[in-house]
Design a protein with these regions (language model features):
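Pre-Walker A adenine-sensing motif
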Residues: 64-78
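Walker A/P-loop nucleotide-binding motif
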Residues: 79-101
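Conserved catalytic/switch belt of AAA+ P-loop NTPases
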Residues: 107-108, 136-137, 154-200
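C-terminal alpha-helical "lid" subdomain
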Residues: 225-287
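AAA+/P-loop NTPase substrate/partner-engagement loops
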Residues: 105-143, 150-155
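Dynamic helix-loop-helix/coil hinge segments at AAA+ ATPase domain boundaries and subdomain interfaces
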Residues: 4-5, 44-68
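Interdomain "pre-motor" coupling segment immediately N-terminal to P-loop NTPase/helicase cores
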Residues: 2-47
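Conserved AAA+ ATPase "SRH/arginine-finger" region at the nucleotide-binding site
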Residues: 183, 199-212, 219-233
């Protein structure tokens, strides 16, 4: 066997061994970023240069929710007891925005460099136990683990990974990690799925209880609801003032209401989309 052939065989063997026992996962550049995204396919925790968020003061109509989540997060940052939180409710009402804004506010108020925001996608939730194990190794840091739009459909068993991770098993949940999830469903399961379980299970009450109890793993339930017209207009006005968008007050009100009617909803998201529209028309930069 010539030397080149031997080297090719050895390289293939090395590659095969690496696939069987991949290198230990780690987080690069922890000090260089405030936010990260977990990528299941590569196993990397990728740093985000700029987190897409707005200041906490711009979030209107959710005063109780802001206080609850801020107090819980500041406790976590200060090594005090804190709960995992489920932010549930209507679409576009500021659930994920609140998590990101609270993270920023806590960083500003504590001057901490060690509180990091890590997002895990809903479809990667089965990797949660492994991710928690990885984060637990970085004891100098604290991690807010965010899963946006979390829910489970019929036939899915990944919710069991979430239950196990939140309970912590015999190892316990890492003290340096807190889990925040947003969802449109209070119990994370569609009602028809739970009703179907009730009708087909050998022991209906136990089967449904297992799924409903998933939300019980969150010590905090923070509800978000559809907003009033006045609150919707307050949100619009706050953005317009913040970004100095030139527009007549009467025109602003009329156009904002027309926008919400055409969208069939009033929410923080709809307000933001309207503001982006009028900012573009007036050639006003908002970032």
């Amino acid at each position: 066997m010539d030397e080149q052939k031997r080297d090719e065989i050895l390289e293939r063997i090395a590659n095969a061994l690496e696939r069987m026992a991949p290198p230990e996962k780690k987080i690069d550049n922890l000090d260089g970023s405030e936010g990260f995204i977990y990528e299941a396919k590569t196993g990397l925790i990728r740093p985000i240069n700029i987190i897409n968020r707005i200041s906490l003061g711009l979030l209107q109509g959710i005063v109780p929710q802001k206080k609850i989540l801020y107090d819980n997060t500041i406790n976590f940052s200060n090594d005090l007891p804190a709960n995992n939180a489920l932010l549930w409710g209507a679409r576009g009402t500021g659930k994920s925005s609140l998590v990101k804004s609270v993270h920023e506010e806590v960083l500003l108020n504590t001057k901490s460099k060690y509180l990091k925001l890590v997002e895990i996608h809903r479809e990667d939730i089965s990797d949660l136990p492994e991710l928690l194990s990885l984060l637990s190794k970085y004891k100098k840091y604290k991690f807010i683990l965010l899963c946006d739009d979390l829910s489970f459909d019929a036939g899915e068993n990944t919710y069991k990974s979430l239950k196990a991770a939140l309970d912590g098993g015999i190892e316990g949940k890492p003290n340096n990690v807190i889990f925040y999830a947003t969802s449109n469903r209070r119990h994370l399961m569609p009602r028809d799925m739970m009703e179907n379980e009730r009708s087909t299970a050998i022991n209906p009450s136990e089967s449904v209880e297992e799924k409903v109890s998933l939300s019980d793993r969150f010590g905090l339930w923070v509800g978000f609801h559809n907003i009033s017209q006045d609150t919707y207009l307050d949100i619009v006005n706050a953005y317009v003032k913040k970004f100095n968008i030139p527009i007549n007050k009467k025109s602003l009100r009329a156009e904002a209401l027309e926008w919400s009617i055409t969208r069939g909803a009033r929410s923080g998201r709809v307000a933001w989309q309207f503001v982006q529209d009028i900012a573009g028309k007036s050639k006003t930069k908002i970032f």
